[in-house]
Amino acid sequence: MKSFTLTTLAALAGNAAAHATFQALWVDGVDYGAQCARLPASNSPVTDVTSNAIRCNANPSPARGKCPVKAGSTVTVEMHQQPGDRSCSSEAIGGAHYGPVMVYMSKVSDAASADGSSGWFKVFEDGWAKNPSGGSGDDDYWGTKDLNSCCGKMNVKIPADLPSGDYLLRAEALALHTAGSAGGAQFYMTCYQLTVTGSGSASPPTVSFPGAYKATDPGILVNIHAPLSGYTVPGPAVYSGGSTKKAGSACTGCESTCAVGSGPTATVSQSPGSTATSAPGGGGGCTVQKYQQCGGQGYTGCTNCASGSTCSAVSPPYYSQCV
């Protein structure tokens, strides 16, 4: 009982300080940063599985553009606690936020304007595995622990049989440290905008968000501070063309070799209505909307915030945002 209580208290103590967001994307080892990510307004979780925020988080900012991806290639999603901080010195998602990592895709007509209401199919999951030496679920192997081991990175195979077109890719980490009561599970997700090229014709079965999860699902309403004999990852099964990772497995590929500033990078074309928009009055001016990036290390975009907001360093020197 004492061990359980201390573990629970430790998890609760880390609750407020260890929120996180998926931010950057690598495509076959090429660093696209956050250019095609709809960055959430904050690093706080979504807890209501019946809200539309369960699709792509609450009030995400428009992405700069769409990342080009070939069907059958590997993308690597990257999570960190603070906006713009891609350092490996801190856990990607700390505070004993243990749980699975899942990735979904949705075929859309235009990734820049899609609202996430179309169907989703799961292409990846890294869930749970028993630690024979552990005494509770906290001691077991989890997808979020793998994120922490791999500097926030998780490799995801894009199914080779997908047809060409625009897609949303939804990366999600589920923290279960307070999931012992209904509404306690914490969902951290970001949607990335992709343009996929391929010759496939697959049409995977889909689920809807909201709708795919229930607050009482066994993988959502669960006490991980007690010993676990099994765990069911929420949502549908992974599509046959996707991939899985066994919790506790070693970092591979880009998870272990990709490092910010030491490899190839790429820039995407700016989508209409994204981060920087023309300011009235001409003169080549631009305006950054509230909650969007306006500065930071390596940033070369617009720095003029829309009326009513100012450019503030939220994670110096990496990231500044209009607030």
Curated annotation (Swiss-Prot):
Disulfide bonds join 56-191. It catalyses: [(1->4)-beta-D-glucosyl]n+m + reduced acceptor + O2 = 4-dehydro-beta-D-glucosyl-[(1->4)-beta-D-glucosyl]n-1 + [(1->4)-beta-D-glucosyl]m + acceptor + H2O. Its main location: secreted. Its EC number is 1.14.99.56. Cu(2+) binds at residues 19, 97, 188. GO terms for cellular component: extracellular region. O2 binds at residues 177, 186. It comes from the Eukaryota. The keyword Lipid metabolism does not apply. It is an enzyme of class 1 (oxidoreductase). One of its GO terms (molecular function) is monooxygenase activity. Binds 1 copper ion per subunit. Lignocellulose is the most abundant polymeric composite on Earth and is a recalcitrant but promising renewable substrate for industrial biotechnology applications. Together with cellobiose dehydrogenases (CDHs) an enzymatic system capable of oxidative cellulose cleavage is formed, which increases the efficiency of cellulases and put LPMOs at focus of biofuel research. Concerted enzymatic process involving the initial conversion of monophenols into diphenols by the polyphenol oxidase PPO7 leads to up to 75-fold improvement in LPMO9B-driven cellulose degradation. Is able to utilize various natural phenolic compounds as reducing agents. Most of these reducing agents are present in plants, either free or as lignin building blocks, such as sinapic acid, or as flavonoids such as catechin and dopamine. Phenolic compounds with 1,2-benzenediol and 1,2,3-benzenetriol moieties yield the highest release of oxidized and non-oxidized glucooligosaccharides from cellulose compared to monophenols or sulfur-containing compounds. PROSITE patterns: CBM1_2 (PS51164). Optimum temperature is 40 degrees Celsius in the presence of ascorbic acid, while most C1-oxidized gluco-oligosaccharides are released between 50 and 60 degrees Celsius in the presence of 3-methylcatechol. GO terms for biological process: cellulose catabolic process. Has a modular structure: an endo-beta-1,4-glucanase catalytic module at the N-terminus, a linker rich in serines and threonines, and a C-terminal carbohydrate-binding module (CBM). The genes for catalytic modules and CBMs seem to have evolved separately and have been linked by gene fusion. Lytic polysaccharide monooxygenase (LPMO) that depolymerizes crystalline and amorphous polysaccharides via the oxidation of scissile alpha- or beta-(1-4)-glycosidic bonds, yielding C1 oxidation products. Catalysis by LPMOs requires the reduction of the active-site copper from Cu(II) to Cu(I) by a reducing agent and H(2)O(2) or O(2) as a cosubstrate. Is active on regenerated amorphous cellulose (RAC). Belongs to the polysaccharide monooxygenase AA9 family. This is AA9 family lytic polysaccharide monooxygenase B. It comes from Thermothelomyces thermophilus (strain ATCC 42464 / BCRC 31852 / DSM 1799) (Sporotrichum thermophile).
